[in-house]
């Protein structure tokens, strides 16, 4: 064979284009309406976006300040997008968050295109709708964390792989590698979680010889390395004295950050780079890296359940059933190829998220959403096509029953929020299951089943979009769902008096403060550059004491600020009083006078 069996592209019904338009416009409305409600979102990344609108070098490296002392602890791809928007439209909450919302619309559109080519427009529309209506998707596509662009690039990679599967195209497979490589530049090794699924689907179903499949996959691996490696190489070759310190690394290296703090450290529990380890237990509930105990049930816990698990049971049931029913199909069967791609995406990502022992946030599961959405849509559509037989109807009924039962449990966790929703879901779900089992397989039954399956999840999604989200660990769903959630890095209470003081400065940095989570509030509220001593948590050795002393001697920093920490440990909120940042603070306290400005202790570094 020279092509995957019968790509579903011919004879598209007239209703499809209007339906796609409704899907994309509805997604845009959901993600863009009042998008600025969250203000600066995660102040840490907002500070870097702001710096990128001031200085191109800061934009390229993802620096926290235009003086390029230290970067964020992630690669800068998402900051590039938000920074360009800020340069075009002016830096604001709106200009920063709109690119993330558009990434969401693009992800839904690309998922539709990918599923349509192998499974037809009905499955494709359903997959797009399921992704759009996943609560954690609405959360992250309206927020400024890197995850929005990660999902866009991963779904783009899935689309390119589907195109490669159709006729064993090397070009499309190389583009798959490029998409994953750029995903690395957004969130490092998390982008590689889909690689097992991509390799499996292509190795099994590509319509060409085994030898050609192998060398094509090796070429695609090369594309990953090149598209990810150019920026890594640029940073490595850039003179160290002329670039910012790579936050989170132990030796100022992007590769060490990728395989250390942002790689194996996330899997096995290593905490942080720099010269002082953050003390996560200083945040109540953060003893297990913000994600609770690792284990097979993690994705169904109070912390994770409401994010992306709504359809996970149905996806697993549909995947197993779909693979069983297609077991005798030709190697290049399109349905099995699609299930291998999206199903393996779901299973591998779910297992990794479940067993990570390091830092993990519930919103990471947004990377699961495309796999779950596509797997459910494809398996449900194929089972519906076989509804004349008992076995497919039984599997559909089980998928629906599992979804309704799990939705009821999730909604019951917020008993005071719209209780009518969970009971409506239960009633409609029971009716749908009964109708499927007795063989009343009409379109009205399909509609009933879809409403029952999606009503609870969609309600959570609407609640998510209507609520402001701030800090480093945002959560989806109604406000009551967040009780007990661990968060940090949210907006600091604005010190109006201090902001006015900083606005009068003309130095390179208006002020310096330990830890980006505190310094970001000063920079964003005053509109002036602020040096985040020690990077994200105050634990990075940047600047060194000698460098800081040179900045002060050169008149580059006007003030050093020590704000109240609300009982959260040392400067920066992660015990940043140790290490290099602690030495800098001690030196300032010994050599400069302090005054109190709006409750903050402020040292004037121009007076000694």
Where are the model-predicted features located?
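Transmembrane helical bundles and short interhelical boundary loops of multi-pass, membrane-embedded
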Residues: 387-492
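Short secondary-structure transition/capping segments
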Residues: 203, 523-524, 543-546, 607
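Short secondary-structure boundary/capping elements
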Residues: 121, 335-336, 359, 490-494, ...
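Short low-complexity, flexible loop/linker segments enriched in glycine and/or proline
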Residues: 207-208, 546-549, 576
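Short periplasmic/luminal acceptor-recognition loop of GT-C membrane glycosyltransferases, typified by
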Residues: 455-460, 464-538, 553-588, 592-606
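Extracytoplasmic/secreted proteins, especially bacterial periplasmic and envelope-associated proteins
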Residues: 44, 48, 76, 80, ...
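Membrane-integral, polyisoprenol-dependent glycosyltransferases
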Residues: 1-394, 402-406, 463-465, 536-537
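Alpha-helical scaffolding within the catalytic cores
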Residues: 242, 250, 542-552
């Amino acid at each position: 064979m020279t092509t995957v069996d019968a790509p579903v592209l011919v004879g598209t019904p007239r209703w499809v284009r209007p339906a796609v338009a409704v899907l994309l416009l509805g997604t845009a409305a959901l993600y863009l309406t009042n998008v600025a409600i969250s203000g600066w979102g995660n102040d840490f990344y907002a500070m870097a976006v702001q710096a990128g609108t001031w200085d191109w070098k800061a934009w390229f490296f993802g620096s926290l300040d235009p003086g390029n002392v230290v970067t964020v602890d992630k690669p800068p791809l998402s900051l590039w997008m938000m920074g360009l928007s800020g340069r075009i439209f002016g830096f604001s909450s709106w200009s920063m968050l709109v690119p993330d919302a558009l990434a969401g619309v693009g992800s839904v559109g690309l998922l539709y295109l990918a599923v349509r080519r192998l499974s037809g427009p009905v499955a494709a529309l359903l997959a797009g709708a399921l992704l759009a209506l996943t609560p954690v998707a609405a959360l992250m596509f309206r927020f400024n964390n890197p995850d929005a662009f990660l999902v866009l690039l991963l779904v783009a990679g899935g689309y390119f792989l589907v195109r490669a599967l159709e006729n064993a195209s090397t070009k499309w497979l190389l583009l798959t590698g490029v998409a994953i490589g750029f995903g690395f530049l957004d969130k490092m090794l998390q982008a590689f979680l889909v690689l097992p699924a991509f390799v499996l689907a292509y190795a099994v179903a590509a319509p060409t010889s085994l030898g050609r499949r192998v060398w094509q996959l090796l070429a695609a691996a090369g594309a990953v390395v090149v598209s990810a490696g150019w920026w890594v190489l640029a940073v490595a070759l850039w003179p160290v004295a002329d670039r910012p310190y790579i936050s989170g690394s132990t030796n100022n290296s992007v590769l060490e950050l990728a395989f250390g703090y942002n790689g194996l450290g996330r899997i096995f529990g290593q905490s942080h780079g720099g010269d002082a380890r953050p003390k996560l237990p200083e945040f109540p509930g953060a003893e297990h890296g913000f994600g609770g105990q690792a284990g097979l049930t993690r994705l169904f816990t109070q912390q994770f359940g409401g994010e992306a698990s709504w359809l996970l049971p149905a996806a697993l049931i549909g995947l197993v059933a779909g693979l069983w029913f297609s077991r005798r199909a030709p190697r290049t069967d399109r349905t099995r190829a699609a299930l291998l791609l999206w199903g393996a995406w779901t299973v591998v990502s779910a297992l990794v998220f479940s067993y990570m022992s390091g830092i993990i946030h519930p919103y990471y599961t947004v990377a699961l959403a495309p796999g779950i959405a596509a797997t459910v849509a494809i398996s449900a559509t194929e089972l519906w096509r076989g509804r004349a037989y008992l076995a497919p109807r039984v599997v559909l009924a089980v998928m629906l029953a599992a979804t309704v039962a799990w939705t009821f449990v999730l909604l019951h966790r917020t008993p005071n929020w719209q209780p009518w929703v969970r009971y409506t879901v239960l009633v409609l779900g029971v009716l749908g299951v009964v109708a499927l089992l007795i063989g009343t397989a009409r379109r009205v039954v399909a509609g009933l089943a879809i409403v029952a399956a999606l009503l609870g999840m969609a309600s959570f999604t609407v609640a998510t979009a209507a609520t402001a989200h701030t800090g480093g660990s945002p959560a989806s769903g109604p406000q009551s769902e967040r009780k007990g959630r661990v968060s940090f890095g949210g907006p600091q209470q604005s010190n109006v008096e201090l902001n006015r003081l900083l606005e009068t400065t003309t130095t390179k940095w208006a002020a310096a403060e330990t830890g980006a989570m505190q310094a970001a509030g000063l920079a964003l509220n005053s509109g002036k550059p602020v040096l985040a001593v020690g990077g994200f948590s105050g634990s990075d050795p940047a600047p060194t004491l000698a460098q800081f002393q040179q900045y002060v001697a050169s008149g580059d920093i006007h003030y050093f600020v020590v704000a109240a920490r609300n009982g959260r440990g040392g400067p920066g909120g992660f015990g940043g009083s140790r290490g290099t940042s602690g030495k800098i603070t001690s030196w300032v306290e010994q050599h400069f006078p302090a005054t109190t400005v709006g409750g903050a202790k402020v040292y004037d570094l121009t007076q000694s």
